[in-house]
Swiss-Prot record:
It catalyses: (6R)-5,10-methylene-5,6,7,8-tetrahydrofolate + glycine + H2O = (6S)-5,6,7,8-tetrahydrofolate + L-serine. Catalyzes the reversible interconversion of serine and glycine with tetrahydrofolate (THF) serving as the one-carbon carrier. This reaction serves as the major source of one-carbon groups required for the biosynthesis of purines, thymidylate, methionine, and other important biomolecules. Also exhibits THF-independent aldolase activity toward beta-hydroxyamino acids, producing glycine and aldehydes, via a retro-aldol mechanism. The keyword Cytoplasm applies. The record marks H225 as: Plays an important role in substrate specificity. Belongs to the SHMT family. Homodimer. The keyword Amino-acid biosynthesis applies. Keywords: Amino-acid biosynthesis, Cytoplasm, One-carbon metabolism, Pyridoxal phosphate, Transferase. This is Serine hydroxymethyltransferase. It is an enzyme of class 2 (transferase). It is found in: Cytoplasm. Its main location: cytoplasm. The gene is glyA. The modification N6-(pyridoxal phosphate)lysine is found at K226.
Length: 413
């Protein structure tokens, strides 16, 4: 980054500091990952200069012959990975992908059935502070009070009662396998569309390690980062009969020019996901998450649903007499990055919370394995149990430093 360093020392310094943070801390935020240098090179390419409103072969600008190739590569690779009939890779984010689906099939005030945010849903699944909850009449389903797993009988009962036009499946903090086939059966029974938001599990689906929602859903949305390990962005997969409507909802509906440099980075990441070693990577994500969950439970920590089937773990910290906010802060102080998170049947404010959400996608990309998961579980428990003991916290910092020093990253940057 010699040019940047010469041109803007302040921005360069901030980027260098962030690189140092990523190298020196253990990244356990479930929605984050470390992309390859190839993905970063594509995103930092000259494609950032090109306007390309429209779609390949139907642009509103000239000079799009090369970016057309890039977008076609991205779309074709997604179709190959997930078996989708139609793909739109232009959404700037998962939220905009969800918005486009809503705009395609819903009218203002239509009823939608979505997962309660504190039970594991997402802001765009009907939260009253989000456009989805403002524009549409969302009815919430959740998890069982004892098992913390989705109660499909309750979903069916609410679907029959409220007759939603759309049912939204998928979550941002649900550590168990979701039965998409059952969701489609429920949707068909009440005459609703089914949209699956697979943002968190897309990489696991790509590797064949989580049921694929594409055969069951009318629409599938996802981010392209998280377990898929691409750049930050979104995309939509749908049945061919909805292709024109979806494309119009993205452009000119809610977006203008696509970010062609990001789409190039998406294409590179999709190519990586088609390689044999990506399945090994995804398997390691799950193995690491399950080993970490076991270690946390051995240390006496309480996990929502009692464990995990995917990359994600939700810790209930109430029995430690601390809040999620305090847990996030003290773990960050020792070099472990997590996020505070609501838990099912939450009583605390979303700015405070009773839980912490962690995930293993990023540490797995870094090369951490089962032994490292045992050590991380021990450090987390040690830190949370001794969160006011500076001597204990200093010991935790040293243990984190030992771990991160064994797994250098981005050494060419």
């Amino acid at each position: 980054m010699d040019h940047l360093k010469r041109q803007d020392e302040k921005v360069f310094a901030a980027i260098e500091a962030e690189l140092g943070r990523q190298r020196s801390k253990i990244e356990l935020i479930a929605s984050e990952n470390f992309v390859s240098e190839a993905v970063m090179e594509a995103q930092g390419s000259v494609l950032t200069n090109k306007y390309a409103e429209g779609y390949p072969g139907k642009r509103y600008y000239g000079g799009c012959e090369h970016v057309d190739v890039v977008e076609d590569i991205a779309r074709d690779r997604v179709k190959e990975i997930f078996g989708a009939e139609h793909v739109n890779v232009q959404p700037h984010s998962g939220a905009q992908a969800n918005m486009a689906v809503y705009f395609t099939i819903l009218e203002h005030g239509d009823t939608v059935l979505g997962m309660n945010l504190s039970h594991g849903g997402h802001l765009t699944h009907g939260s009253p502070v989000n456009f989805s909850g403002v524009q549409y009449n969302f009815v919430e389903y959740g998890v069982d009070a004892e098992t913390h797993r989705i109660n499909y009988d309750d979903v069916l009962a609410k679907a029959k009662e409220h007759k939603p036009k759309l049912i939204v499946a998928g979550a941002s903090a649900y550590p168990r396998v979701i039965d998409f086939k059952r969701f489609r059966e429920i949707a068909d029974e009440v005459g609703a569309y089914l949209m699956v938001d697979m943002a968190h599990i897309a990489g696991l689906v790509a590797a064949g390690l989580h049921p694929n929602p594409v055969p069951h859903a009318h629409f599938v949305t996802t981010t392209t980062h998280k377990t898929l390990r691409g750049p930050r962005g979104g995309m939509i997969l749908c049945e061919e009969k909805f292709a024109k409507q979806i494309d119009k909802s993205i452009f000119p509906g809610i977006q203008g020019g696509p970010l062609m440099h990001v789409i190039a980075a998406k294409a590179v990441a999709f190519g990586e996901a088609l390689q044999d070693d990506f399945k090994t990577y995804a398997q390691n994500i799950i193995h690491n998450a399950q080993r970490l969950a076991e270690g946390l439970q051995k240390e006496g920590l309480t996990l929502v649903s009692g464990g995990t089937d995917n990359h994600l773990i939700l810790i209930d910290v109430r029995n430690l007499n601390i809040t999620g906010k305090v847990a996030e802060h003290v773990l960050d102080e020792v070099g472990i990055t997590v996020n505070k998170n609501t838990i099912p049947f939450e009583t605390a404010s979303p700015f405070v919370t009773s839980g912490v959400r962690i995930g293993t996608a990023a540490v797995t990309s870094r090369g951490f394995g089962l032994e490292e998961m045992d050590e991380i579980a021990s450090i987390i428990a040690h830190t949370l149990k001794n969160h006011e003991d500076e001597t204990a916290l200093e010991e935790a910092r040293k243990r984190v430093a030992v771990l991160t020093s064994k797994f250098p990253m981005y050494t060419d940057l």
